[in-house]
Amino acid sequence: MEKFGPMIREIRLAKGMTLNELAKDIVSVPFLSKYERGASDISAENFFQLLDRLNVRLSEFEALNANLKQETQDSFLEKYSYAANNDNLILLNQLLADEKQYYQQSANIRHLHNQIILKQYINNMTHLPYSQEDSKVIKEYLLQVEDWHLYEIELFGNSIFFLPLATTEFLVKTAIKKTYLLDRISNNKHVLAQVIANVITKMIEADELMKARQLIELGKRQLTHTKFYYEKTYLHFFEGYCLLKEGKELGENYCQQAIDVMKMLKDYETANHLTAYLDEHGFKL
């Protein structure tokens, strides 16, 4: 962690704190001075104590540290999302080359997982079959992890498109079981809710309406006592869609209510997407 010392110094000076004020009861002043020059390492415990004394959250520190940001998973996901949404094959291949290099340098398994996601998406874009071996790597990793954290939730969410439906169904239930200890972390629960919504969409596309309805109910329970209005509205829409597929008029009301909520919140892009989804599947409101 010695490379973060100079950034700690910048934050300290920006907050008008002296070395003595920051170091008090955490580390010695000479040690802190040495650490801030990048000449010494520091324990994780002391590093977090310094951040706490500075009143800076780890997420804020990551955003402030340009060098660190280049290597974060958030940075990769941001670039991947942009490339995928724009069908930018050149950028996808560049990201793939970068992830191969990062993996060679660090042996961090996330860079291997990122390569798999990229290769599978490129296969999809170029009309090639998904690699079953690569799918197996993701599946086995997720199954052997005892407790899922944000990384595992996001990995699963970004792998849904190439995993077999049966695997996806099993893993979403695994995700719910293995993240219960992290329910108090709002962002993890929020991301999990989005993942559940994506699995529901996949089940509906496969015409597995009963399984989709079961997962909708599971998703609704997950969202109890939360303010995740987008996800709640999204589930309401697809509950309505399932009812429409079953020939029940109530489904039209549910879908219209969900779209009206999106319009009221000025989320016209999602409202248009949901309306187009109905049109594509033979339903008009």
PLM regions and their residue ranges:
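"A position-specific structural signal for the A-helix of alpha-solenoid helical repeats
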Residues: 7, 78, 112-121, 154-158, ...
